[in-house]
Structure formats: structure tokens, C-alpha cells
Amino acid sequence: MINAFALEDARLVRIDENTNAELNSAIWLDLIEPSSEEREILQEGLGQSLATFLELEDIEASARFFEDEDGLHLHSFFYCEDEEDYADLASVAFTVRDGRLFTLRDRELPAFRLYRMRSRSQRLIECNAYEVLLDLFETKIEQLADVIETVYSDLEKLSRVILDGTQGEAFDQALSTLTEQEDTSSKVRLCLMDTQRALSFLVRKTRLPANQLEQAREILRDIESLQPHNESLFQRVNFLMQAAMGFISIEQNRIIKIFSVVSVIFLPPTLVASNYGMNFDIMPELGFKFGYPMALGLMALAAFAPYWYFKRKGWL
């Protein structure tokens, strides 16, 4: 799908028809999983070849940030959620050429959707492709800041459950959610680092107007301010995970202690019972009228004596 936008009164206006004449007036062409026919339209009408989705998966810096005859290329990660609401990353290709911005992605993304909504009423200042690119990155960082705030709030709720130490269904669910928050934080960190590298490359390779250069530097400062907050999330997750493992270990030790006490208590009575289970011809107690009650009493005493001794020593 091709979403083309042209400038009208310093605002982005969507182009309804994807003809060559209409596309030539576009300043931003946003492509979501384009078909081979749509790729051919761009190739024939604008002379622009697009990256493949396999190329978007390359993580080497030389393959993600470069400049060639097809323009300036940036491949950047954007935070999103998959169909099961788990944290995910989508790689987006940005290409700036002949005053146009081309974006290529394989799915709809919250940052793009939010920027399109804002662009209906928001005027561009410099009215060029780099401003649209920087605005998208700015929206991306705002989204990441919101994600960090959400994780902070979720960890606050999880800490109450985990630090309470009461194990059960809520405790197990908290552990599962904790691992999800760790995964979310790691993806946010990757997005921040990736955006930092992309903007640094953009500032080095282009001569941006003063306003846009300041905007790029402001985004970089925002990234630097968010990174410590995100790192503190990792520390909080690690603390809660260690606390949870500690409570689990204590509970396991308590259960093992119970089994140990039971085995110690019942071992002496078992010894008494095994003595009277021996098959000897001469066992005086067998002929004694009160032999059986005496054996039961001896077994009870053998069970109580070690329990009393261990209790007095403070071992239980």
C-alpha cells in the first residue's frame, strides 16, 4: 500500500490517486508492505528502487546507515506490539532523495499513525523531507517515553505482589509479567540506541537548516535523558526477580524442612517397630500381657524425644 502526502498550505495532505503525476507532487511516500506492482510504479514514475524486507533485517551499521545514488538511507527500529500484545520491534527504511521522503515498513505502527493524525492540523516550518523524518523520530521518542512510564507503573504494582512474599496464582502471574517487562525494556533500549545512531549519522551526512539541526540535537538530548530511566528499569526488574527467587527459595527450604522433621520424628519409631518385627524364638516381650501397649508407648516416646530435643536446641 502506498500512502502519498503532498504539501498544501504547509500541511501534509494525503494524495488519493497514486498516478505518476500525483506522486511527483508528493513530499512523503509511506509504503506499507508494497506489492511488486507498487514497487514498479515508484521505479518507473520516480526512478526510486526500494529496499527488500530481507535487507531491513541486517543489523550492521554499514547496511543500516549509508548514502548512494538512490539517496540517503536510514534503517531504524520502531517499538510496537504483536498480535498477542507482546513487545516487538519493526524495522523501517527511510530514504531521502530529490526532496522526497520514502518510508518502507511491513506493518502499521503507532508512531506513524499518531504523526499522521497530528499532521492534519500541524504546519511544517521548513517544509522539506528532512522535517518529516525528524518529526517521525520525535514522535517515536515520545512513544518510547510513554512506554517507559507504563513499565514504571506496572513494576510498582508488581513490586507489591512480589515483595509481599505470599506465593500463589497472583505471585506466579507477577513473575510472568515481570519477564515481559524486562523484554519490553530491552526493546526500548535497542530503539533508543538505534535512533541515536541514526540521528548522529543524519547530522554528520547532511547540512540541515538551523531549526532542523536544533531539532535533531533536541531529540538526541531526549534520548540521553531517557536512557538512564530505562537502565533503572532493568535494575528494578533485576531486584524484583532476585527478591522473587529469594522468596521461592525460602518456601522450598520450608517445605524441605518439614519433610526433614517428619523423617527424623518417624525414624526412631520405625526402628522400634523393626526390632519387634524380627523373627527370633526367644523374645520375652512377645509373651508379656501389656507388650503391645508398651511397644506403642516406646514408639511414641522415640518420636517425641528427638522432636523435643531439636525444639529445645532451636533447630526447629
Curated annotation (Swiss-Prot):
InterPro entries attached to this UniProt entry: CorA_cytoplasmic_dom, CorA_MIT, CorA_TM1_TM2, Mg/Co-transport_prot_CorA, MgTranspt_CorA/ZnTranspt_ZntB
Gene Ontology terms, MF aspect: cobalt ion transmembrane transporter activity; magnesium ion transmembrane transporter activity; nickel cation transmembrane transporter activity
Subcellular location: Cell inner membrane
Residues the UniProt record annotates as site (Essential for ion permeation): N253
Topology class, membrane: Multi-pass membrane protein
One GO CC term, this protein: plasma membrane
Sequence intervals crossing the membrane: 258-278, 290-310
Sequence motif Probable selectivity filter, location on chain: 277-279
SUPFAM superfamilies: CorA soluble domain-like, Magnesium transport protein CorA, transmembrane region
Primary site of residence: membrane
Keyword annotations: Cell inner membrane, Cell membrane, Ion transport, Magnesium, Membrane, Transmembrane, Transmembrane helix, Transport
Reactions accelerated catalytically: Mg(2+)(in) = Mg(2+)(out)
NCBIfam families assigned: corA (TIGR00383)
Function noted in UniProt: Mediates influx of magnesium ions. Alternates between open and closed states. Activated by low cytoplasmic Mg(2+) levels. Inactive when cytoplasmic Mg(2+) levels are high.
UniProt domain comment: The central ion permeation pathway is formed by the first transmembrane domain from each of the five subunits. Mg(2+) binding strengthens interactions between subunits and leads to the formation of a symmetrical homopentamer surrounding a closed ion permeation pathway. Low Mg(2+) concentrations trigger both a conformation change within each subunit and a loosening of the interactions between subunits. This results in an open ion conduction pathway. In addition, this results in a less symmetrical shape of the whole complex.
Subunit structure and binding partners: Homopentamer. In the absence of Mg(2+), interactions between subunits are weakened, and dimers, trimers and tetramers can be observed in vitro.
UniProt record similarity statement: Belongs to the CorA metal ion transporter (MIT) (TC 1.A.35) family.
Protein name per UniProt: Magnesium transport protein CorA
Lineage of producing organism: Bacteria, Pseudomonadati, Pseudomonadota, Gammaproteobacteria, Pasteurellales
Name of the gene this protein is made from: corA
